[in-house]
Curated annotation (Swiss-Prot):
Belongs to the peptidase S16 family. ATP-dependent serine protease that mediates the selective degradation of mutant and abnormal proteins as well as certain short-lived regulatory proteins. Required for cellular homeostasis and for survival from DNA damage and developmental changes induced by stress. Degrades polypeptides processively to yield small peptide fragments that are 5 to 10 amino acids long. Binds to DNA in a double-stranded, site-specific manner. It is found in: Cytoplasm. Keywords: ATP-binding, Cytoplasm, Hydrolase, Nucleotide-binding, Protease, Serine protease, Stress response. This is Lon protease. InterPro entries: AAA+_ATPase (IPR003593), ATPase_AAA_core (IPR003959), Lon_bac (IPR027543), Lon_bac/euk-typ (IPR004815), Lon_lid (IPR054594), Lon_proteolytic (IPR008269), Lon_Prtase (IPR027065), Lon_prtase_N (IPR003111). SUPFAM superfamilies: P-loop containing nucleoside triphosphate hydrolases, PUA domain-like, Ribosomal protein S5 domain 2-like. GO terms for molecular function: ATP binding; ATP hydrolysis activity; ATP-dependent peptidase activity; sequence-specific DNA binding; serine-type endopeptidase activity. Disulfide bonds: none annotated. Induction: By heat shock. It is an enzyme of class 3 (hydrolase). Its EC number is 3.4.21.53. The lineage of its organism: Bacteria, Pseudomonadati, Campylobacterota, Epsilonproteobacteria, Campylobacterales.
Length: 831
């Protein structure tokens, strides 16, 4: 056959796959050029060349592969719609030598040359063929690609290239993969490539078989379950056990009717609608569980259930006094609120038609951590005998946590407010919104905006929960919020609350709280008797001053608990027989009397005495809450007063002057406001020096080169650079209240005048020298008192407005002086 080649043959393009020499395959033609080519070949008894069409084309590239099969047309038949069916017999592989061209008769012709295989080592090839056949048999066991007759044909054939073609044709390879096998004339390489392909195909077929098996098993299991469920339904129907669902539905309808008088029409219709849907829903439907959960949740909301016990102001006072020491002002404000509520209740009994106008009270306790804000709310709930619900808002950033999730979501549930009503089983509980200043905004909404509706007495009568899908009356709920910093609460939300300050405790107040509340409570928690642990007065004072740094008493409780734990351990070490004792053995000991106890070695008079001398054995770490003041009066050091989230503090401010050009340098992690305060203070001091309100000798400049003629005389603030530093540089500081302290230390260093060490001050300074009021006065003065300060300078407006809030102990031991302007400050500060 190769003698007459290369020769020009008609070209046909097969769309789907490669044809092989041994194949007799039907081909369908619809293209006119291809039909003309077949007619020409049949009339002239010519061979034809069939190439496979490419899926992806590059620019200037033929739309078919350059290899294909040479063969003859065995039979031709016309089909409907102008199509032609022919039976093609493949004879040999061929390659297109030059691009095909369209001839005068209107079909493609190409110059074709047969593909000749390279010589090969028969023994080596035979070994590879055997491996290939083994892999094919393995593949045949897990797939239907190789039927038995094809396996037999492979076994009977000795031509390795024919075997490779048979396998490649059966694998239905992708066109590019088939092309490389088809065009390769290296027999050994073709066989090795086929082995890799067969191995990969075997893995794929095994995986598909496993997946199909699992799917089939699951379908069988599903069908089986469905069949069994249908049988079970029929059995239940015969036995009458399916009546349980009907009974549940009847109970839902009955409960809905019982609370109908307390429901708005909207709420009644929504719940009834969902019960009706539940009755029509198949029990095995996924909607059934969702609907049932909704109905049961909504029917659990205590509509119409109110705590009806009348308010008693006397009882409220007693409860607050029993639970909390000091806090006189907050207690008074709380009692005033509930006195108003009690009066409203009394008047509404006479005029029932006005009862619905009673609005829930909204209080917000704010102050440092550990001062008793949340426990005050607990005491209020006890005092008015209503259930307490606590909702932690710290870090809350999803509005749906408050408003509820819509029922379109899987696992949806009502918001925390509605859940709180269900938990309380009353519609008028005390609801504590803890840490309301720590609510965050995110892409999931702004919870603070939802709180506007919840806390507004004019709106919360119709609070709409997304899960419930109807409005709920919250007007009878007593909302109590707690916060550390009310400045972080949005202004519209602040406008809806009444704020009650719960500020820092004085050392003596902490001591009384520890004696009357903390120590008895911790003794009980640790199973110790009051006679077994004795904490002396001096020791308790030392714990408060040296081992805690806080405005409240939370850390003080922890320190006392540490002592109790070590006391409990000491008790067990001294009385080892007490380990694992039973009630029976204890009763026996009692009957045996003291003699038996002494035999067992129990100390009858066990007592751990905690004194300042042995305190380090129980508490190892000292905090030193506030450093004591220096007794020596120094130039360039002043005592400022600062407010922190954990209470007040004495803030020392230092200044030095360096020969320079009058520049001001600030260090100590100061914020923008505090830096501006320093600049204002520097300008005010300059004005005082210019006016000679502050007197200081003028500083001569350096002489000229000949040391004869002096230049002009400089003012002190132009002759020196001023460096102002606020210690603890790693701690950020900000705020305007250090203005007068900064001015004092600048005046001290520039005038070389010492500052009284027993004086501390706080106040904002204006450019005209006036002293403006500041916040956190109580905490600042308590800090001054703890540090041993004798005189505290405060703005006159704070003196007039806030002095009555200062604890009596502080007012009696601290000389509090009101100042109007910087001149008065410097007069009382500089020596």
């Amino acid at each position: 056959m190769t003698e007459d080649f290369p020769k020009i043959l008609p070209l046909l393009v097969e769309e789907d796959t490669f044809l092989y020499p041994f194949m007799i395959a039907p081909i369908f033609l619809q293209n006119n050029a291809s039909i003309k080519a077949v007619a020409y070949a049949k009339n002239n008894k010519s061979l034809v060349f069939i190439a496979c069409q490419k899926d992806k084309l590059n620019d200037n590239e033929a739309p078919y592969y350059d290899v294909g099969v040479i063969g003859s047309v065995m039979r031709e038949a016309n089909m409907p719609n102008g199509r032609v069916k022919l039976l093609f017999n493949g004879i040999a592989k061929g390659r297109i030598l030059e691009p095909a061209k369209e001839n005068e008769q209107g079909f493609l012709e190409a110059q074709i040359s047969p593909i000749e295989y390279l010589e090969y080592d028969k023994e080596n090839i035979q070994a590879i063929v055997e491996v290939l056949k083994e892999k094919v048999i393995t593949l045949a066991n897990v797939s239907s690609l190789f039927p038995p007759d094809l396996i037999k044909a492979l076994e009977d054939n000795d031509d390795p290239n024919r075997i490779a073609d048979l396998i490649a044709a059966a694998l239905h390879l992708k066109k590019d993969q088939a092309y490389f096998l088809f065009a390769n004339n290296n027999t050994e390489q073709r066989l090795l490539d086929l082995i890799d392909i067969v191995i990969e195909e075997t893995k794929t077929q095994k995986l598909q078989k496993e997946i199909k098996s699992k799917v089939h098993q699951k379908m069988e299991q599903t069908n089986k379950e469905y069949f069994l469920k249908e049988q079970l339904k029929q059995i239940q129907k015969e036995l009458g056990t399916d009546k349980q669902r009907d009974e549940d539905l009847n109970q839902y309808y009955q409960k809905l009717e019982s609370i109908k008088p307390f429901l708005k029409e909207e709420a009644f219709k929504e719940i009834k609608k969902q019960i009706d849907r539940l009755s029509r829903t198949h029990a095995d439907s996924s909607d059934s569980a969702t609907l049932q959960n909704y109905v049961e949740t909504m029917l659990d909301v205590p509509f119409g259930q109110y705590e009806k016990k009348a308010l008693d102001i006397k009882h409220v006072k007693e409860q607050l006094d029993n639970d909390h020491y000091s806090l006189k002002r907050p207690k008074e404000r709380i009692v005033e609120y509930f006195a108003t509520m009690q009066l409203l209740e009394m008047r509404h009994k006479k005029k029932p038609e006005k009862k619905d106008k009673t609005k829930g009270t909204i209080l917000c306790f704010y102050g440092p951590p550990g001062v008793g804000k949340t426990s005050l709310a607990n005491s209020i709930a006890k005092a008015i005998e209503r259930p307490l619900v606590r909702i932690a808002l710290g870090g809350l950033e999803d509005v749906n946590e408050l408003r509820g999730h819509r029922r379109t979501y899987i696992g949806s549930m009502p918001g925390r407010i509605v859940q709180g009503l269900i938990e309380a089983k009353k519609m008028n509980p005390v609801m504590v919104l803890d840490e309301i200043d720590k609510v965050d905004r995110s892409v999931r909404g702004d919870p603070a905006s939802a709180l506007l509706e919840i806390l507004d007495p004019e709106q919360n009568i119709a609070f709409r929960d997304h899960y419930a899908n109807f409005s709920i009356d919250l007007s009878q709920v007593i909302f109590i919020a707690t916060a550390n910093n009310i400045d972080r609460i949005p202004a519209p939300l602040r406008d809806r609350m009444e704020f009650i300050s719960v500020s820092s405790y004085t050392p003596s107040e902490k001591e009384e709280i520890a004696k009357n509340y903390l120590i008895p409570q911790e003794l009980e928690k640790h199973a110790l008797k009051p006679s077994e642990v004795d904490i002396s007065h001096e020791c308790l004072k030392l714990i408060i001053e040296k081992y805690t740094r806080e405005a409240g008493v939370r850390d003080l409780r922890r320190q006392i608990a540490t002592i109790m734990r070590k006391a409990a351990l000491k008790y067990l070490e001294d009385n080892p027989h007490k380990k694992g004792r039973t009630k029976k053995s204890e009763d026996k000991d009692k009957k045996g009397g003291n003699e038996e106890n002494e035999k067992r070695g129990e100390s009858k008079d066990f007592c751990v005495s905690i004194t300042p001398d042995n305190l380090k054995e129980y508490l190892e770490r000292m905090v030193f809450e506030i450093d004591p003041i220096d007794e020596e009066n120094k130039i360039g050091i002043v005592n400022g007063l600062a407010w922190t989230p954990v209470g007040g503090d004495v803030l020392k401010i230092e200044a030095v002057k360096i020969r320079g050009k009058g520049e001001l340098k600030l260090t100590g992690s100061l914020g923008d406001v505090m830096k501006e305060s320093a600049i204002i203070a520097f300008s005010v001091v300059k004005v005082l020096l210019d006016n000679e309100t502050l007197k200081v000798p003028k500083i001569p400049s350096e002489t000229d080169a000949e040391n004869k003629k002096k230049k002009k005389v400089l003012k002190v603030y132009n002759a020196y650079d001023l460096h102002l530093h606020v210690p603890e540089g790693a701690t950020p500081k900000d705020g305007p209240s250090a203005g007068i302290a900064m001015a004092s230390v600048m005046a001290s260093i520039l005038c070389d005048r010492a500052i009284r060490s027993e004086v501390a001050m706080t106040g904002e300074l204006t450019l005209s020298g006036e002293v403006l009021p500041i916040g956190g006065l109580k905490e600042k003065l308590i800090a001054a008192f703890k540090a041993g300060i004798k005189t505290a300078l405060i703005p006159v407006k704070n003196y007039e407005r806030d002095l009555d809030e200062i604890p009596t102990e502080v007012r009696e031991n601290l000389n509090i002086v009101a100042v109007k302007n910087i001149a008065e400050v410097l007069e009382k500060t500089l020596l």
